[in-house]
Amino acid sequence: MAKLGKISDENQKLVDEAIVKTGLNNYMNIRCLSIAKQKPVIKVSRANATTEYVGKLSDTVFLYIKENVFDMLETPQKIMVVQDALSQVSYDIEKDKILITKPEICVGLESYRIYGESIIKTMEAAYMAQQAIDEAEREKKAAERENKKKK
């Protein structure tokens, strides 16, 4: 099992400021833990039912930070990494539910080294094209349902 611990006060303050800026603290508890063995520098995870029950931590999301790597970053880079991780977390007010999504754009490091910023813009264009196709399909299905109701 991975060894978990408390993150440094300096890093906790930085993360807390980022959380407050997002407003997520109004809808859920976000806890930060230091973890020694994980691949990503930062990982977002929802507390499971056992954790919520035993720890009395309802509506809790954990940020697992690989602190030895995180501490090698400059403060602006740390903020960027935390904000990127928090961008995966949202709260659906209508359904009263915490949502954790995967990033819309994933780019391999080798592709980024070769193409630079243009790969990001290309992947964004591809994502937007897919969104347009999905929206057109939803509209088409809605129109078909309306036509069936009219008949």
PLM features: residue spans?
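Subset of Sec-pathway N-terminal targeting signals
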Residues: 40-43, 60-65, 87
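Active-site scaffold of zinc-dependent metalloenzymes
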Residues: 47-76, 92
